[in-house]
Amino acid sequence: MHQKLLKSAHYIELGSYQYWPVLVPRGIRLYTYEQIPVSLKDNPYITDGYRAYLPSRLCIKSLFILSNETVNIWSHLLGFFLFFTLGIYDMTSVLPSASASREDFVICSICLFCFQVCMLCSVGYHLFSCHRSEKTCRRWMALDYAGISVGILGCYVSGVFYAFYCNNDFAPRVVVMYVIALLAFLFYISKVPERYFPGQLNYLGSSHQIWHILAVVMLYWWHQSTVYVMQYRHSKPCPDYVSHL
């Protein structure tokens, strides 16, 4: 049985391993950079592990195989579940224990909803970017960009409402978020580290995967900062601000 599985496996280059066996469903194969359509040629330093020319059904099935999109997909799918779980926890425990107002519930709900939309749109694009229809791929890419915009909106809604409510003491938290975002963007545009290790980081450790993980870290940091500022605001109101109302 073990020998049969090895015979039916697709062999990939995984780091220093030249022939690493990967089982893929029937109808799915992994391509090299030279074999994929132009629309998928974004990073020449990722040389192998591409999915391409798949119908929707097989795109979904490819969620459970090892490809160069696996980390990109699962990092944001798990990110979605993280923010979904945080939403339930915030609404049932964190906000009530802080004697949060109706406005707090609304702001935190908007923030976490935006983060979840961002994660799901990203998952959708990276899952269906291998679709045989280039038009479908471009639609999912547009949704991915829209999701990024919605995620940024979630940051600004809570930021405007809380961060500078009374003073600028919370500015360092905002700065940290932007530093993480900048770091993620630098990995994205520089294509480091795979630029220095072509073909060695096709499946794990590429710049886009680091970008995805840092995006989750950034949004999680912003959520934690929002909760922190909300709790601080309720425990230590701003008398100077209130006196001028």
Where are the model-predicted features located?
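Multi-pass alpha-helical transmembrane bundles in non-GPCR membrane proteins
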Residues: 1-245
